[in-house]
Structure formats: structure tokens, C-alpha cells
């Protein structure tokens, strides 16, 4: 997984899975969420996602109290959010 801020969006790309997500990437994502210019998270570059992506979303929710807009959230992550009954928290 890679993430970078572009035009106020955190652009997430690559595979976001429990096999690929590590502590360094989580810390970077958390710091990106805390930046005042960040207003949304764009998942359009994600090639594969599993429950690790839910963890990222919960980090964003905690850091910004749900104020970040989610763009192009993968359908697999939407399904997991529904399964875990957190879709209302994530406003999806």
C-alpha cells in the first residue's frame, strides 16, 4: 500500500491487505489524516482490499471525527463494513 496527499486528498493505492499493511504505513496514513489540508481519502488506486482497509478507515474516523470524505471506496470494503456493522460510523 502507498498513500500520499494530493490536492487535499489522501490518495491510497496498491493492495491494502493484512499481508501488505505494516506499522510504518499505518503511522504515515494517520499523520496524513491529521493534516489540516486533508479533506478526503481517495481509494481509486486500490487494486485489492480486505479488513486492513477497515482498520485504516477507523484510524481516519478517530483522528478526524468522521470529517473526511471517502472517494471510490472498494465494494469489498463496503461489504466488510456492513458485515462488521460499522457502515454507519463510516457514513457509507
Give the label of every model feature segment.
Residues 1-52, 59-92:
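STAS-like cytosolic regulatory interaction modules
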Amino acid at each position: 500500500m502507498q498513500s500520499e496527499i494530493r490536492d487535499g486528498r489522501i490518495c491510497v493505492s496498491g493492495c491494502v491487505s493484512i499481508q501488505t499493511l505494516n506499522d510504518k504505513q499505518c503511522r504515515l496514513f494517520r499523520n496524513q489524516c491529521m493534516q489540516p489540508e486533508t479533506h478526503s481519502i481517495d481509494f481509486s488506486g486500490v487494486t485489492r482490499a480486505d479488513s486492513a482497509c477497515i482498520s485504516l478507515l477507523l484510524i481516519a474516523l478517530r483522528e478526524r471525527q468522521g470529517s473526511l470524505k471517502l472517494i471510490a471506496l472498494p465494494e469489498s470494503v463496503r461489504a466488510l463494513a456492513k458485515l462488521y456493522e460499522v457502515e454507519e460510523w463510516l457514513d457509507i
